[in-house]
Regions:
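Acidic-glycine-rich active-site phosphate/pyrophosphate-binding loop
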Residues: 66, 166-176, 264
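Phosphate/diphosphate-binding loops
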Residues: 132, 136-150, 154
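Short acidic active-site motifs
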Residues: 121, 145, 167
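Short alpha-helices
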Residues: 90, 169-213, 225-229, 234
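Hydrophobic helix-and-loop "lid/oligomerization" segment in the mid-to-C-terminal part
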Residues: 2, 9-131, 152-153, 204-384
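Short, acidic/small-residue loops that bind anionic groups at enzyme active sites
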Residues: 154-169, 384
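Short, ordered loop/turn segments at secondary-structure junctions
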Residues: 79-80, 108-111, 138-139, 161-164, ...
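Amphipathic alpha-helical transducer elements in NTP-driven molecular machines
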Residues: 143, 168, 189-192, 196, ...
Length: 384
C-alpha cells in the first residue's frame, strides 16, 4: 500500500495591515510570518518593548544597586549553551561597564554539575566568595539550589526565559517574561534578551540615583552589547517576533559595521564568514554551533572566556579551540548516524513483515539508542 503525502499550505493572514507600497511578494512573506502591522516592521531601538513591563525587574535592580554600593561579590551563574554563554558574558560586561568591579561568573559543567543552579553549583559559587548570585538563562526550576543558597545567606536573582512550573523558587527577585503575572508582550525573549533588559533597567536606576554623577563617569552605551544579544537570540532558535527582530537586526548591523566583540570577530574569521555580508543564518549555523560545541564536549567556560576577551589575538586562539571541538562534534555525530543507519537496515526485514502480515505501517519512525553515544549530542542527532 503506497502512502499518500501532501504538503500543507500555510495561508497568509489576509487581515494584516501592511504598508500599501510594499511589493506583493514582500507582503505575502511578512504576512506568512505572522507580521500583521507596519509597527512590527520597525527595526530601530525606539521600537523595542519597554523594560518597565517586565515584572520583578524593579526589585532586581534595587538589589543590584545596593550590591554595587556595598561592594558585594556578585557571581553570575550561566548555562552551557550559546544563549547561556552570551547571557553570562553580557551580564558581566554590562555590570562592569555600569561600575561594578566585584563580579565574576560560573558556568556549570554539563557532565559534572548538570543543568541550572543546583546546590552543588551554589557551593562552588560560595567557594568563590559569592555574596549575591544572579542566574542567566536558567534558575526558574532551581528550587533546591535557591533554597540552599538561602541557607548559606546568599540572595539569588533569577533571570530566565524558560517556562515556569507550578511553583517558583524562593528567590529575592525573578525576571521571566513567561511568568503568569508578567505583562511583557513578548514571550519569546531568549535568556540573553532578558539579561539585556535587566542591564537597561539597571542603567536607568543607577542614573536616577546619581551613581554616575557621584563617580564622574558617563552612563555606558549598552547598544555595544547588542552583538551578543543577536548571537544568543538566533542560536537559541527562539521565535523572531517583532521585538526579537529589532534586537537581532540591531546586533547584526553592529557586527556588519565591525562594532562587535573580538570574540565574535574571531568566530567569524574561523568560520570564513564576511562580516559585511553577515546574515542571521550565519549566527545560527556557523557561530552558534562552535559556541555550543564547548558545552557539549568540554566546558562552556571556554566560550564565555572568548566572548569576554578584549584582545583579538587571544580571541583567535580560543576560537581555534572551539572550532576544533566543533569538528570533533561533527565526527562523533557522523559516527552515531552511521551506527543508527546500520541498525535501521537490520530492521528492514521486520518492517516488511509488519506490512505484509499485519497490514500496518510504522508512522512515527524508529527510536535508536546506544549506551555509547554521548548524551550531550543525542538531541542534535535526533533532530537530524
Amino acid at each position: 500500500m503506497k502512502q499518500q503525502r501532501q504538503l500543507r499550505r500555510r495561508e497568509a493572514d489576509e487581515t494584516a495591515e501592511l504598508p500599501a507600497d510594499l511589493p506583493p511578494l514582500l507582503r505575502r512573506l511578512y504576512a506568512s510570518r505572522g507580521v500583521r502591522s507596519a509597527r512590527e516592521l520597525e527595526r530601530s531601538v525606539k521600537g523595542m518593548l519597554p523594560w518597565q513591563q517586565l515584572s520583578g525587574i524593579d526589585n532586581a535592580v534595587e538589589i543590584l544597586y545596593n550590591a554595587f554600593r556595598e561592594g558585594t561579590r556578585i557571581i553570575v551563574v550561566g548555562d552551557f549553551d550559546a544563549d547561556g554563554a552570551t547571557s553570562t558574558a553580557l551580564s558581566v560586561l554590562g555590570m562592569r561597564a555600569l561600575g561594578c568591579d566585584n563580579i565574576s561568573y560560573l558556568v556549570p559543567n554539563r557532565f559534572e554539575d548538570g543543568y541550572g543552579l543546583s546546590p552543588e553549583v551554589v557551593d562552588q559559587a560560595k567557594a568563590r566568595g559569592a555574596q549575591l548570585i544572579v542566574t542567566v538563562d536558567n534558575g526558574i526550576s532551581s528550587h533546591a539550589g535557591v533554597a540552599h543558597a538561602k541557607t548559606l545567606g546568599i540572595p539569588v536573582i533569577v533571570t530566565d526565559h524558560h517556562l515556569p512550573g507550578d511553583t517558583l523558587p524562593d528567590a529575592e527577585a525573578i525576571i521571566n517574561p513567561n511568568l503568569r503575572d508578567c505583562e511583557f508582550p513578548s514571550k519569546s525573549l531568549a535568556g540573553v534578551g532578558v539579561a539585556f533588559y535587566l542591564m537597561l533597567a539597571l542603567r536607568t536606576f543607577l542614573r536616577d540615583k546619581g551613581w554616575f554623577d557621584e563617580r564622574n563617569i558617563a552612563p555606558p552605551n549598552l547598544a555595544e552589547l547588542l552583538d551578543l544579544v543577536a548571537l544568543g537570540t538566533v542560536a537559541d532558535v527562539v521565535p523572531l517576533d517583532a521585538n526579537n527582530r529589532i534586537l537581532t537586526w540591531q546586533g547584526l548591523s553592529r557586527i556588519r559595521a565591525g562594532k562587535c566583540r573580538p570574540g565574535i570577530k574571531a568566530l567569524l574569521e574561523i568560520s570564513n564568514r564576511d562580516p559585511q555580508q553577515l546574515a542571521a543564518s550565519d549566527l545560527g549555523f556557523a557561530l552558534g554551533p562552535r559556541l555550543n560545541a564547548a558545552g557539549r564536549l568540554d566546558d562552556m567556560s571556554v566560550g564565555v572566556a572568548l566572548l569576554l576577551c578584549d584582545n583579538l589575538g587571544e580571541a583567535r586562539v580560543l576560537a581555534s579551540e572551539l572550532d576544533a571541538l566543533n569538528q570533533t562534534r561533527k565526527e562523533i555525530e557522523q559516527g552515531m548516524q552511521a551506527e543508527a543507519l546500520i541498525l535501521c537496515e537490520s530492521l528492514s526485514a521486520v518492517v516488511k513483515r509488519f506490512r505484509a502480515v499485519w497490514r500496518c505501517i510504522i508512522l512515527n519512525g524508529i527510536r535508536a539508542w546506544s549506551e555509547f553515544w554521548r548524551r550531550a549530542l543525542k538531541s542534535v542527532f535526533t533532530a537530524r
